Design a protein with these regions (language model features):
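Polyanion-binding interface signature
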Residues: 2-134
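Charge-dense, extended regions
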Residues: 137-139
Length: 149
């Protein structure tokens, strides 16, 4: 089994990188209830789910930052486990936004791919080291390089 995967913080639509207005980095805009401005999920694309079906545990698990200073209770969610979310939903999002130097003052503030790209990062690395999971930001283009291997 691979000891790490790289996940995008964006989606693709017709070959273009995009941050949809009501999902992933902008989950706070989704309908249904009032949401925290930092509510996000990390997309798990089908090519990752198909190539690494047993990478994530079935139940919730602890995801630590690489420096070990922060940890999040996370699990895969949504249909076909296509999203990685924290509980509460805003914990992981707040860490991601802080690391990227991006701010959302209101749930309806939308982050676009150009803003994400300008930070120099557009993906995350999730490592499984001896059954413990770690997250770190990865530079622009890392996800594409990973899936081309």
């Amino acid at each position: 089994m691979n000891s790490y995967i790289i996940l995008p913080l964006y989606s693709t639509s017709q070959g273009e990188k995009i941050c949809f207005s009501k999902s992933s980095m902008n989950q706070s805009n989704a309908a249904g209830r009032n949401r925290d401005p930092y509510e996000v999920y990390i997309p798990i694309p089908s090519e990752i789910r198909n190539s690494f079906p047993a990478f994530f545990p079935e139940d919730s698990f602890e995801l630590k930052t690489k420096n070990g200073k922060e940890s999040f209770n996370v699990k895969t969610c949504q249909e076909n486990h296509k999203a990685l979310m924290s509980n509460p939903n805003s914990d992981l999002g707040e860490w991601i936004f802080n690391q990227l130097g991006l701010t959302k003052n209101n749930p309806w503030d939308i982050i676009n791919y150009t803003q994400l790209e300008a930070t120099g990062y557009d993906s995350v690395k999730i490592e499984n080291i001896d059954g413990k999971y770690y997250i770190s930001l990865m530079p622009v283009g890392s996800y594409e390089n990973f899936v081309r291997k």
